């Protein structure tokens, strides 16, 4: 089943107009959460025991924790981006080399940003933030770029793939808040308008080539260089210093909990291998199979926002 939504942006009027035939509402959040079996009380007890025994718990989250906030993931059966469309995420090399590709990316990102940036943490994000405040969570590593952990108050946090809230200059490294860049887009494109369909996990939406052609893209205010979101695009690599930092946190931990990730991407999977080699107990909470199910002592197929708030971190 194909599922989508539509928003119309009118830059001259400075507002979004929801398509009444497919409104974006709280009901749409469930569109991106794959089906899962009812909670198994025995599995809940097993996870509770796992958390109770953990003294230096490291948690790694993926896109599955944010689907309940209305942000789709890529790989979930029937509801992920790959299942709903033949579109694929932008490649790092293409973005760096091609001005038309950068123009298309930023036009789509400009249209999608107001909705993407408005998403809020769900009970799973708040639960992990509470665990940190109570001293249960030693470190949190997220593969997501949506800033929802930060919005929930998490501070002992590594954003493995960066964050869409920030923009970097590819030439001089100048960092700009994404909201500030949105204002520059509006100044450069006062009469530009487009209708967007479908939201991607990185805030991208889908526009036609004709819609994109007239869109003006700002450059770095410091050096005139090209701007890029402070995220790791597909085909790029995570900063080695960040990788080393996370490896150290894993080695300092006494247990690892994976939340909402299939671990198909090696950038996150490698830390599971490190934990396994260190003989740390590994628990996985994810709807559907993961790359590391055979390494885990506990696997739960449940919604993150339904299960995590049931766990007592004390």
UniProtKB/Swiss-Prot annotation:
Record-listed Zn(2+) binding positions: 169, 172, 220, 223
Q: State the top-level EC class.
A: transferase
Requisite cofactors: Zn(2+)
Q: In which broad location class does this protein mainly occur, judging by the first location in its UniProt entry?
A: mitochondrion
Alphabetical list of InterPro entries matching this protein = DHS-like_NAD/FAD-binding_dom, NAD-dep_sirtuin_deacylases, Sirtuin, Sirtuin_cat_small_dom_sf, Sirtuin_class_II, Ssirtuin_cat_dom
Example GO molecular function term? NAD-dependent protein lipoamidase activity
The subcellular location is: Mitochondrion matrix
Catalytic site:
161 (proton acceptor)
**Transit peptide, residues from-to:** 1-28
Domain named Deacetylase sirtuin-type is located at: 37-314
Give the record's GO biological process terms. Answer: cellular response to hypoxia; DNA damage response; glutamine metabolic process; mitochondrion organization; negative regulation of cardiac muscle cell apoptotic process; negative regulation of fatty acid oxidation; negative regulation of insulin secretion; negative regulation of protein processing involved in protein targeting to mitochondrion
Could you give the cofactor binding note from the entry?
Binds 1 zinc ion per subunit.
Tissue spec: Detected in vascular smooth muscle and striated muscle. Detected in insulin-producing beta-cells in pancreas islets of Langerhans (at protein level). Widely expressed. Weakly expressed in leukocytes and fetal thymus.
Enzyme Commission (EC) number? 2.3.1.-, 2.4.2.-, 2.3.1.286
Listed A to Z, the keywords are:
DNA damage, Glycosyltransferase, Metal-binding, Mitochondrion, NAD, Nucleotidyltransferase, Transferase, Transit peptide, Tumor suppressor, Zinc
**Residue positions binding NAD(+):** 62-82, 143-146, 260-262, 286-288, 304
Intrachain S-S bonds: none
Additional record remark: Expression is down-regulated in a number of cancers, while overexpression reduces cell proliferation, transformation, and tumor development.
Its annotated function is as follows: Acts as a NAD-dependent protein lipoamidase, biotinylase, deacetylase and ADP-ribosyl transferase. Catalyzes more efficiently removal of lipoyl- and biotinyl- than acetyl-lysine modifications. Inhibits the pyruvate dehydrogenase complex (PDH) activity via the enzymatic hydrolysis of the lipoamide cofactor from the E2 component, DLAT, in a phosphorylation-independent manner. Catalyzes the transfer of ADP-ribosyl groups onto target proteins, including mitochondrial GLUD1, inhibiting GLUD1 enzyme activity.
The record ties this protein, via NCBIfam families, to: PRK05333.1
> How the protein assembles, per its UniProt entry?
Interacts with GLUD1, IDE and SLC25A5. Interacts with DLAT and PDHX. Interacts with MCCC1 (via the biotin carboxylation domain). Interacts with PCCA and PC.
Concerning its family, UniProt says: Belongs to the sirtuin family. Class II subfamily.
Q: What is this protein called?
A: NAD-dependent protein lipoamidase sirtuin-4, mitochondrial
List the top taxonomic levels of the source. Answer: Eukaryota, Metazoa, Chordata, Craniata, Vertebrata
């Amino acid at each position: 089943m194909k599922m989508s939504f539509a928003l119309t942006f009118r830059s001259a009027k400075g507002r979004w107009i929801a398509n009444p035939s497919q409104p974006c509402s709280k009901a749409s959040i469930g569109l991106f959460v794959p089906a899962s079996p009812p909670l198994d009380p025995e599995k809940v007890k097993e996870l509770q025991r796992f958390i109770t025994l953990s003294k230096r718990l490291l948690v790694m989250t993926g896109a599955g924790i944010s689907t309940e906030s209305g942000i789709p993931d890529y790989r979930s059966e029937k509801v992920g981006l790959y299942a709903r469309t033949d579109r694929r995420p932008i490649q790092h090399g293409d973005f760096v080399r091609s001005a038309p590709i950068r123009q298309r990316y930023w036009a789509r990102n400009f249209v999608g940003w107001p909705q993407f940036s408005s998403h809020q943490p769900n009970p799973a994000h708040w639960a992990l933030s509470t665990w940190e405040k109570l001293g249960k969570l030693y470190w949190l590593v997220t593969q997501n770029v949506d800033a929802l952990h930060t919005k929930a108050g998490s501070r002992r946090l590594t954003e493995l793939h960066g964050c869409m809230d920030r923009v970097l200059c590819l030439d001089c490294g100048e960092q700009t808040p994404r909201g500030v860049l949105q204002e520059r887009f509006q100044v450069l494109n006062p009469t530009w308008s487009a209708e967007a369909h479908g939201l991607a996990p990185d805030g991208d939406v889908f526009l036609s080539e004709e819609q994109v052609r007239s869109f003006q893209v700002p450059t770095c205010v410091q050096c005139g260089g090209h701007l890029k979101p402070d995220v790791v695009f597909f085909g790029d690599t995570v900063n080695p210093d960040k990788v080393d930092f996370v490896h150290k946190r894993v080695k300092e931990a006494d247990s690892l909990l994976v939340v909402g990730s299939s671990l198909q991407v090696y950038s996150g999977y490698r830390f599971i291998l490190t934990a396994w080699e260190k003989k740390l107990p590994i628990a996985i909470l994810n709807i559907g199979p993961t790359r590391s199910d055979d390494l885990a002592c506990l696997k739960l197929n449940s919604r993150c926002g339904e299960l995590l708030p049931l766990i007592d971190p004390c």
